[in-house]
Regions:
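Polyanion/phosphate-binding surface patch
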Residues: 34-64, 414
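Domain-level signature for soluble enzymes in the chorismate/prephenate branch of the shikimate pathway
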Residues: 317-532
């Protein structure tokens, strides 16, 4: 009797296919309990996707947690013998905060781990299985590959202080060139060193194009060894079926990952569906001398594949349309005029219509007209490929997007302001009125000051006048509103301007279109600056 799996949901079909793939590769199924000692996660917080964990006290008084991660538990309990390679696969649920609902969510994962004696053969097998896993999911896919050894080697060659490396890698991962150079300067690097780091941004694309440049940029043996491994892996994956891209800005946590890192994307899904890498540094916390490599497939992301296409995408076109989230208002008008001037205009005047979607198929462009505070949300969740958003909104939302360009438009600054006669009283918390709650918390935490937050949505300047707060945290452009209400700027702590952002998955499939738009946009902004 044959069982027809076509009636199953995409993630159910995938679980059958992946199980067969991993067992054929010699992997044994690993089953773990639902709970784990909280101390394991507390000691390895930076390895987790979020530090938020569901905890409870067991009947014997132990503090336990619903597992937010599987790899940590396997690494802790595997204990491979010397010269032994353990191969496990798993199908488990983990419990993490959801970006959509802002509540904890049960997330289905399948994954594979190789632990113990992990050499070149095991690494090749693991990455090959990652590519085969994407192939089993039945959609066009991209596997993005990088190497922590290459990044560490460059940081060593540039004598970058250990304390500054994590911040620099964070800017690289976000493709945030403008802030990368600022962070490099803050780390004491000279202009040549900052330019060398910035050069990693260009090492992104097809293996044929990027690998020779990766090899040419090597400065020491560590970088050369990493480049050689990347070459071997790309040769291994030459006939994999999807698209293999090198991106030397991709990085994992410094204290855990030491070799290859990779992410897999499916067309039409807004986030990576596969993540993995070599994590010897984590494994050696539990088994000295052991190595490890593995990856996880996020099955719940596949639920989107069974959803109907949104109306805006139902009219198929042979061309690739770039979907732009455009903020309504003065900033949006400035941005649109700039884009229209470089060939991305629409025949329809969006200010003369109540339509929220305007497009120009001849220019391969489609605009979504959205509230400025929602731009980052549309882009992060893949409804739009790119968008223009203020740095204030981007920081407040902590959006997981690529920040590709500082346009310099809409310049202002985030400030602490207070009545003219205000004096800080360190004996009590500062009462802060703001609509930028996360930004305010982060700033005051950085200076070690206790605060009480009062969230407001408008007329923030009124709060200290009425005694509702001591100070406000808000955007200041000219300062006129502050002065007319008897307030003064106490501290300026964050410059703000409009940023060009991109969805990370869209960038894998529409990078040519995005790069072309970026190149034209940079040229237009430079020409505009010269005219001043």
């Amino acid at each position: 009797m044959k069982f027809d799996i076509s009636c199953l949901q995409p993630k159910e079909q995938a679980s059958f296919a992946l199980r067969a793939l991993y067992e054929a590769a010699g992997c044994r199924k690993y089953h773990m309990g639902r709970f784990e000692e909280y101390g394991l996660y507390q000691e390895n917080r930076s390895f987790l996707s979020s530090e938020q964990v569901i905890t409870f006290t067991d009947l014997d008084g132990r503090l336990l947690a619903l597992k937010p991660d599987v790899t940590l538990s396997i690494a802790k309990t595997a204990q491979p013998a010397p010269d032994e390679t353990l191969r496990y696969y798993y199908h488990e649920n983990v419990y993490r905060p959801s970006a959509e609902s802002h509540t904890f969510k049960e997330i289905g994962q399948m994954g594979l781990e190789m632990l113990g004696d992990v050499g070149e053969g095991q690494v090749r097998q693991a990455v090959s299985l990652a590519a085969q896993s994407l192939e089993q999911l039945g959609q066009p896919w991209v596997l993005e590959v990088s190497h922590m050894g290459y990044l560490f080697g460059l940081l060593d060659a540039l004598d970058v202080p250990e304390a500054s490396r994590a911040a620099l890698l964070a800017k690289l991962k976000a493709k945030n060139l403008h802030e990368l150079k600022a962070a490099a300067s803050a780390a004491g690097m000279d202009e040549a060193g900052a330019d060398a780091l910035a050069g990693l941004m260009s090492l992104c694309g097809s293996c044929e194009d990027v690998l020779p440049r990766v090899e040419a940029a090597c400065r020491n043996e560590r970088m050369e060894a990493a480049a050689a491994e990347l070459k071997a892996i790309t040769e291994e994956l030459a006939g994999a079926g999807g698209s293999i891209r090198l991106d030397m800005t991709l990085a994992g946590e410094m204290e855990y990952y030491n070799g290859l890192v990779f992410q897999g994307y499916l067309e039409s899904l807004p986030r990576p569906v596969l993540k993995g890498g070599r994590y010897d540094l984590l494994m050696q916390k539990f088994t000295p001398g052991a190595g490890a490599i593995g990856f996880a497939v996020y099955l719940d992301e596949l639920d989107r594949l069974s959803a109907p296409l949104p109306p805006v995408q139902q009219q198929k076109t042979e061309k690739t349309m770039l979907n732009v989230a455009l903020p309504r208002g003065r900033l949006g008008d400035k941005v649109y005029d700039l884009l229209a001037g470089i060939g991305y205009g629409c025949p329809e005047d969006y200010n003369a219509t109540r339509k929220l979607v305007v497009e120009n198929p001849a220019a391969d462009i489609r605009y979504f007209l959205v509230k400025p505070s929602d731009v980052a949300i549309y882009v992060e969740h893949g409804a739009a490929d790119v968008g223009i958003v203020g740095k204030d909104i981007l920081t407040e939302a902590s959006a997981d997007v690529y920040e590709l360009l500082d346009t310099g438009l809409g310049k202002c600054r985030m400030c602490v302001a207070a009545p003219a006669d205000y004096k800080d009283d360190p004996s009590r918390p500062v009462r802060v009125a703001t609509k930028f709650v996360n930004i305010a918390k982060s700033y005051y935490a950085s200076i070690g000051r206790d605060i009480d937050i009062i969230k407001l949505n408008g007329s923030i300047e009124l709060a200290p006048i009425l005694g509702l707060s001591d100070v406000i945290v808000d955007i200041v452009e000219t300062g006129t509103t502050l002065r007319e209400n008897g307030l003064r700027v106490v501290t300026e702590f964050m410059p703000i301007s409009a940023r060009f952002i991109a969805n990370k998955a869209s960038y894998q499939f529409k990078h040519r279109e995005m790069d072309e738009m970026l190149e034209k946009l940079r040229a237009a902004l430079a020409a505009k600056e010269e005219k001043k």
